[in-house]
């Protein structure tokens, strides 16, 4: 579940009753604010980097057409919250995206807090900020008026603990078989909560077919690698790199896969590439050290074990690696 809390904690908002925006809201021609918003949301719902960028462009055009069009500000808040959370996950600069989300969410709420589109954006934003209680409350208010709002059902499921056996997530996929977050969320829940790696792989595969992106190919590859399907995993990591040649996690995971295949030089090369793109991944330093040790270069192994310990900062999730690194430093004579 999400662990990051940001400035939206301070957002003063009273959530009251709201009305549902009907299709009449989009009756304007495609060049009007409503039409541009509709096009922007279609791009957003592709859940791809290119779709997000296009959505921002269209939402800004909608605001230019009508500076008081609340839905467009809500759309910007949505997409910026997704982009901020993504960058937080991959350990890249994210604060500007959350600040943009906050600014646009506040504007949408100021103009018309009761629109379904505004409430949905608010629910998404709460979810991305680990405000699960508020996300659930907001989603439930939407569902009280519109029981088949796919996105609200998904938010409610996610904010309620992401139970992979819940009928809610199945209902989302029945209502909208192309809703990418549901496939990714369910795959992650199956992977981490049930260790049902085969099932998780199928949902990651479906997500990659609908919305190919570096992030999804990387997740798909890791699910394959966990089951020992190393060559297939390599293929997915290479697809991730093709989608985004600057996506550090794909190089890191590609390197780890080569390590498991005893291709230590290829492991080291890919880990160094990952670090050159983003130095904030402790795993990369650890597997470089492992690779050097396997390649009979103890001096470099010690250097990278020590770098791993510096970067990991004794985070609990790296406790096992840290214990191993300290033991190997001592065994290799690097503790002197």
Question: What role is predicted for each listed range?
Answer:
Residues 25-37, 92:
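TPR-adjacent "capping" and linker segments in tetratricopeptide-repeat scaffold/adaptor proteins
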Residues 33, 70-71, 116-117, 150-151, ...:
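Helix-start (N-cap) detector for alpha-helical repeat units in TPR-like alpha-solenoids
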Residues 34-61, 65, 181, 185-192:
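Alpha-helical segment of the N-proximal tetratricopeptide repeat
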Residues 41, 78, 124, 158, ...:
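Residue-level recognition of tetratricopeptide repeat
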Residues 50-57, 85-107, 128-141, 160-171, ...:
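Structural signature of tandem alpha-helical TPR/SEL1-like repeats
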Residues 65, 111, 145, 175, ...:
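Structural marker of alpha-solenoid helical repeat scaffolds
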Residues 294, 299-336:
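Terminal, low-structured helical/coil segments at or just beyond the last alpha-helical repeat
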């Amino acid at each position: 579940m999400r662990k990051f809390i940001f400035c939206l904690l301070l957002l003063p908002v009273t959530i009251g009753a709201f009305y549902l925006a009907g299709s009449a809201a989009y009756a304007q021609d495609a060049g009007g604010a409503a039409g541009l918003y509709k096009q922007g949301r279609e791009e957003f719902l592709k859940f791809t980097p290119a779709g997000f960028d296009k959505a921002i462009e269209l939402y800004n055009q909608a605001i230019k057409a009508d500076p008081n069009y609340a839905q467009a500000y809500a759309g910007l808040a949505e997409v910026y919250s997704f982009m901020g959370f993504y960058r937080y996950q991959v350990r890249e600069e994210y604060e500007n995206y959350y600040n943009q989300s906050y600014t646009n969410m506040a504007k949408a709420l100021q103009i018309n807090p009761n629109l379904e589109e505004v409430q949905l954006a608010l629910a998404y934003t709460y979810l991305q900020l680990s405000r699960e209680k508020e996300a659930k409350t907001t989603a439930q208010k939407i569902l009280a008026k519109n029981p088949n709002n796919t996105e609200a059902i998904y938010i409610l499921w996610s904010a309620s603990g992401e139970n992979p056996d819940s009928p809610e997530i199945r209902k989302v996929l029945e209502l909208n078989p192309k809703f990418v977050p549901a496939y990714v969320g369910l795959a992650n829940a199956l992977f981490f909560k049930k260790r049902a790696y085969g099932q998780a792989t199928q949902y990651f595969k479906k997500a990659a077919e609908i919305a190919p992106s570096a992030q999804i190919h990387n997740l798909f590859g890791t699910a394959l690698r966990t089951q020992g399907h190393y060559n297939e995993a390599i293929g997915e990591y290479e697809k991730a790199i093709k989608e985004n040649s600057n996506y550090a996690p794909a190089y890191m995971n590609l390197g780890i896969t080569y390590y498991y295949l005893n291709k230590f030089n290829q492991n080291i090369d890919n880990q160094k590439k990952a670090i050159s793109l983003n130095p904030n991944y402790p795993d990369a330093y650890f597997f470089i050290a492992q690779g050097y040790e396997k390649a009979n270069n103890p001096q470099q192994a010690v250097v990278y074990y020590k770098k791993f310990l510096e970067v990991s900062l004794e985070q609990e999730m790296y406790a096992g690696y840290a214990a191993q690194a300290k033991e190997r430093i001592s065994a290799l004579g690097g503790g002197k």
